[in-house]
Amino acid sequence: MKRIAIAIDRVDWHARRLHAAFLALDMAPRFVSLRTVAFTPEGLRFPGLEGLPDAVFVRAIAAGSFEEVTRRLGILHALAARGVAVWNSARAIERCVDKSMTAFLLAAAGIPTPETWTVEGREAAAAVVLQAATELVLKPLFGAQGRGLQRIRVPEDLPPPEAVAGVYHLQRFVPPAGEDGFCDYRLLMCRGEMVAAMARRSAEWVTNLHRGARPAAFAPTPEMMALAARAAAAVGADYAGVDLIGAADGRILVLEVNSMPGWRGLQSVAEGSIAAILARRLVA
């Protein structure tokens, strides 16, 4: 019986469904907080576990100091070095948590994405705003769930450095392609295949479910599925939430790639259990 560690600090809706999905596969799942895993002279020590798990599903990494987060990512690196399957790998998580690296890798792979700049200091950011000569979106470099987004039209709109930890991550704003309000798309990808998809519609420009957007069933085109698969591969993710948006010129652009995506909204419009699909593919 394979032992599966579900890495999470607070057991949430997703973790409970993953646990049930692994049980249904006759696996032995357990919740593990990475903060409790230790580096020892003998190697990694998991509390209450003899040896190492057979696989690790990283549902979330808790916030902490730079040193704490670095150590937790180090645990994932060490597990992979010992041959343990880790979803997602520390490398993929590092690439996706840092939005500037995600944007760089997408562009390097030739994947269409809104023009993006990441600079330090308000003066450098102001120069970007003037150079772009169009509306931009300021995003936290480390951020999720639509928090902290701000539209920037002129340099005076830029917040002070202390409000953004000194880093300005600016992406060209993509206006609505149609007349039905704001809409983008989330595709959940796993090993190059789509697991589920939804459209997110909102009267506001931030189309995040945590900000009031509404999920809707959606059948993506082959082009969209191929683009999402390429985006997940570009960051090295085994599974990922890929956000797409339609531009006014008809192009489909990749906005972001999430290496620890939630799927509660997706599950509300999807057929079958998403957790069951992910669990089955991890242990395949």
Q: Model regions: which residues?
A:
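Rossmann-like NAD(P)H-binding beta-loop-alpha module
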Residues: 109-133
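A long amphipathic alpha-helix within ATP-dependent nucleotide-binding catalytic cores
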Residues: 205-254, 265, 276-284
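Short acidic-glycine loop/turn motifs at beta-strand connectors
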Residues: 26, 189-193, 247-250
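Conserved N-proximal alpha/beta basic substrate-recognition cap immediately N-terminal to
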Residues: 9-115
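Glycine-rich phosphate/pyrophosphate-binding beta-alpha loops
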Residues: 258-270
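Protein kinase-like catalytic core scaffold
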Residues: 136, 195-196, 240, 253-256
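Extreme N-terminal starter segment of soluble prokaryotic enzymes
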Residues: 1-5
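Phosphate-binding site of ATP-dependent enzymes
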Residues: 145-232
